[in-house]
């Protein structure tokens, strides 16, 4: 009697192992890529106090109740382990999302100010899109976000400029007569 379950090919075990190994290697490579992309500031706790201006150092055992080993390091070389890298990747993405939200709010405020100034001065502002934020327009181009479902021409990028000036080119507004 064989110890291999019925219906399995003894040669397929090696192939499964190779495929599994290849899959794990890909995952590990991507995790290391994340580690290289995420700013080191997000790993301050995992690398210890190196590079910071804190008065406490790694040579002070028991500082703040921590042992001399860096907080939660799962590797022998003191680098963050896979779980910590993934956790910090999520933190970094959240940080970036907050930055985008802040910039969107600032952009909306500037758009409101631009329309108010245009009304006060009687100036026509047609070289910027005052309907949607630049983030909304950019996301709609890749099929994501609140404007992704709209396939009509209501979402357009800013009008093509007629002059080489970024803003204030009088050629954009005709000859003035």
Curated annotation (Swiss-Prot):
InterPro entries: bHLH_dom, HLH_DNA-bd_sf, USF. GO terms for cellular component: cytoplasm; nucleus; transcription regulator complex. Residues 168-177 have a biased composition (Gly residues). The modification Phosphoserine is found at residues 50, 52. Residues 11-96 form the bHLH domain. PROSITE patterns: BHLH. CDD domains: bHLHzip_USF_MITF (cd11387). The modification Phosphothreonine is found at residue 60. Its main location: nucleus. Gene3D superfamilies: Helix-loop-helix DNA-binding domain. Present with 2190 molecules/cell in log phase SD medium. Binds DNA as a heterodimer with RTG3. This is Retrograde regulation protein 1. It comes from Saccharomyces cerevisiae (strain ATCC 204508 / S288c) (Baker's yeast).
């Amino acid at each position: 009697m064989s110890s291999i379950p019925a219906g399995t090919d003894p040669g397929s075990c090696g192939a499964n192992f190779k495929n599994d190994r290849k899959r794990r290697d890909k995952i590990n490579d991507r995790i290391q890529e994340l580690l290289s992309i995420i700013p080191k500031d997000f790993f301050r706790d995992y690398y210890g106090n190196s590079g910071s201006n804190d008065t406490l150092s790694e040579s002070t055992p028991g500082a703040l109740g921590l042992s001399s080993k860096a907080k939660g390091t799962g590797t022998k070389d003191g680098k963050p382990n896979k779980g910590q890298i993934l956790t910090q990747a999520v933190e970094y993405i959240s940080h970036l999302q907050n930055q985008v939200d802040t910039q969107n709010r600032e952009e909306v405020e500037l758009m409101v100010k631009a329309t108010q100034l245009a009304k006060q001065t009687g100036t026509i502002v047609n070289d910027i899109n005052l309907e949607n934020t630049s983030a909304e327009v950019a996301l709609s181009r890749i099929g994501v976000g609140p404007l992704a479902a709209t396939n009509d021409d209501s979402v357009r990028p800013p009008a093509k400029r007629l002059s080489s000036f970024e803003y204030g080119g009088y050629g954009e507004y005709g000859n003035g007569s």
